[in-house]
């Protein structure tokens, strides 16, 4: 089973994350940020990852540290669960519609972290959640998971729909990218022999 747990404690946050890449989409999310809980629940369900996330953060200041550190810890757990990446499909992409919004997500489990994030929001908040934290979470996750990740919203009006299309797109792309390709016969999918 490809699974891992990470605990991360700083002066700003105390986080415990567990992920099972070969799960059923079960989740138990408690970040203290309702909208982020919703997005991570979508991530688990659409990637078919089992995901447990507990964040105690300095929400009396704002949501930034909790959102970013959650992305860091989840990225670290994802990378640890993947191990040496033997047999994975590695590359995946998807166009994910959410009502009027359409987002393209492309991922390479490369071990070379990089994020291209071409998504904009017309409003500063979704409920109490700062929309700029969507990018912060994706940046933290991609850097710590070792992913080359491209997220581009082609169009959309509703900020909730745009954010949801980003997270669901990530989920569906990761679901394909981490899938074991039986033709790889346990090899690392790289001419270098490692990722």
Curated annotation (Swiss-Prot):
Reactions performed catalytically: D-erythro-1-(imidazol-4-yl)glycerol 3-phosphate = 3-(imidazol-4-yl)-2-oxopropyl phosphate + H2O
Location(s) in or outside the cell: Cytoplasm
NCBIfam families for the chain: PRK00951.1-5, PRK00951.2-1, PRK00951.2-4, PRK00951.2-6
GO annotation terms (biological process): L-histidine biosynthetic process
Protein name: Imidazoleglycerol-phosphate dehydratase
Pathway named in the protein's UniProt entry: Amino-acid biosynthesis; L-histidine biosynthesis; L-histidine from 5-phospho-alpha-D-ribose 1-diphosphate: step 6/9
Similarity comment: family membership: Belongs to the imidazoleglycerol-phosphate dehydratase family.
UniProt entry keywords in alphabetical sequence: Amino-acid biosynthesis, Cytoplasm, Histidine biosynthesis, Lyase
Signal peptide per UniProt: none
Principal place of residence: cytoplasm
Keyword Amino-acid biosynthesis among record annotations: yes
GO CC, any one term: cytoplasm
Gene3D superfamilies xref list: Imidazole glycerol phosphate dehydratase, domain 1
Organism: Methylobacterium radiotolerans (strain ATCC 27329 / DSM 1819 / JCM 2831 / NBRC 15690 / NCIMB 10815 / 0-1)
Gene: hisB
Pfam families xref list: IGPD (PF00475)
One Gene Ontology MF term: imidazoleglycerol-phosphate dehydratase activity
InterPro entries, alphabetized: IGPD_sf, ImidazoleglycerolP_deHydtase, ImidazoleglycerP_deHydtase_CS, Ribosomal_Su5_D2-typ_SF
EC number: 4.2.1.19
């Amino acid at each position: 089973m490809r699974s891992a747990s990470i605990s991360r404690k700083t002066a700003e946050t105390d986080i415990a994350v567990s992920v099972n890449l070969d799960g059923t989409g079960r989740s138990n999310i408690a970040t203290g940020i309702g909208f982020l809980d919703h997005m991570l629940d979508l991530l688990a369900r659409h990637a078919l990852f089992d995901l447990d996330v507990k964040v105690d953060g300095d929400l009396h200041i704002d949501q930034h540290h909790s959102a970013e550190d959650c992305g860091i810890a989840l990225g670290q757990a994802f990378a640890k669960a993947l191990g040496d990446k033997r047999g994975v499909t590695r590359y995946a992409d998807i166009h994910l519609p959410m009502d009027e919004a359409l987002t393209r997500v492309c991922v390479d489990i490369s071990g070379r972290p990089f994020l291209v994030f071409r998504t904009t929001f017309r409003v500063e908040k979704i409920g109490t959640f700062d929309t700029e934290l969507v990018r912060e979470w994706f940046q933290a996750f991609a850097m710590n998971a070792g992913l080359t990740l491209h997220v581009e919203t082609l169009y959309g009006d509703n900020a909730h729909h745009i954010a949801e299309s980003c997270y669901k797109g990530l989920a569906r792309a990761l679901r394909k990218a981490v899938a074991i390709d039986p033709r790889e016969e346990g090899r690392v999918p790289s001419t270098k022999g490692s990722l």
